[in-house]
């Protein structure tokens, strides 16, 4: 039966759109099928092949054409054919209400609960609908050539009366209870549907701020926005600050700007001073924090290894000024609130560096940015923002992000299958989450951060052509720091590092005269010019007051005056040729570098 129906669709001739139909009506075409009604065996075979809709549709057509034609179609009048059909359906409504509707309700329930996923057999049956006769564009493309002559007499006449599918129009007035999904469609025959993005909750434009009302504490200052150009972690516990994954030693941009909806902040000028620091959670004991920093510092290859570094990029010089290394884990700079500031920072520690045990989970750190009124130094804190960071090595941040994306994909895929089985969840290829991590403003403006300054003397570096002051000379910053000397020495460095952490005030020089072959050691009690004079006086039994000039001659022949800075940083464990010259009763000392 179904094979015969497959040959009933209309074949449209492309050249003659006004071609008349050869068959007078559908009653004659269906009369021979009424003589052989569908049997239970035929229905069972069709249902076994998954063609429940076909069984219901054929049963409905059999019942429909058993009704006399006079009750189905009104005699043609002045109105159009489409209006006649609509009126005939209204008149026929009373007959439908009294009709035995077992097959009818079965068809409606199955039809309404379907998810528009059909097999190829269903698609063929759908082409029997009169909608395809009215709209030729809905017909499927044929793989073979059409022979117009062979099919001139093979035309259906259903659209001679109806404008659209009569089954839909006929049963519009019938009220059917809400359908329920009763069968699982075969996934093999699923049609392509628009695939939703599983990360649509985090796909946002850069201009949109992710700091929503429920994300920021109510009393937090929102005058400034601080962002870290690094992908934000997907899985974050509720109530925690956002987290970013970073690679050790890689530089990341940090952007600071004034929020568009900022309130009036009474600043003394348009400049503010921001301090970027890597700290532990401020709720932790300061002694415990310093103990961890000491443990990390003792395992570094050099005593001058810093926790946070700043890169000498052009973007830094154009947007910020007065970059200072406040501590080993902090740096400060000045920027204009009317312009967006950008600075590139790199972190030189791993999250697993703070424990001597292997296999211990890494300790998350906080990237904290404190902003002060520039004219008041660090006396007036006006904004504080924090985000969590985890530092990995060897591109570990990218691997961690990919792992989280796969977990998110599986979680979203399972939930999508449970809630809506006709939609396939997907993930954007190469998508790495949000490209920015917004630092969360906090309300705690009283807690002082623990900044790490080892027991060695270091000088601030010169950045962007600006000579920076020493950290000890800036009294405004003393309230910001917490030196390790303020706490008891509860940590001892390993023996391999104790020599590095010895008293840095001592400088050792190796000197000899040109006539000598063996060097003498000059131990300077103080790393300055006075200490050098005192050591030479004691070693060679010369009156210290007679030593007037001390020069250093470099390997390239440059003669420079020896000063405290050269002695402190460029003379320790260096070998020199000592030349003592008597000039007008005074002794002139020249150290030739070897």
Swiss-Prot record:
UniProt feature coiled coil, ranges = none
Single Gene Ontology MF annotation: DNA binding
Q: Which Pfam families match?
A: CP2, GRHL1_C
Which UniProt keywords are given for this protein, alphabetically ordered? DNA-binding, Nucleus, Transcription, Transcription regulation
Q: For this UniProt entry, what's an example GO CC term?
A: nucleus
Other facts? GRHL genes (GRHL1, GRHL2 and GRHL3) show a paradoxal lack of redundancy despite their extensive sequence identity in the DNA-binding and protein dimerization domains and the fact that the core consensus DNA binding sites are identical. They have related but remarkably different functions during embryogenesis because of their differential spatiotemporal expression patterns during development.
UniProt name for this protein: Grainyhead-like protein 3 homolog
Q: Which organism is it from?
A: Xenopus tropicalis (Western clawed frog)
Name the gene: grhl3
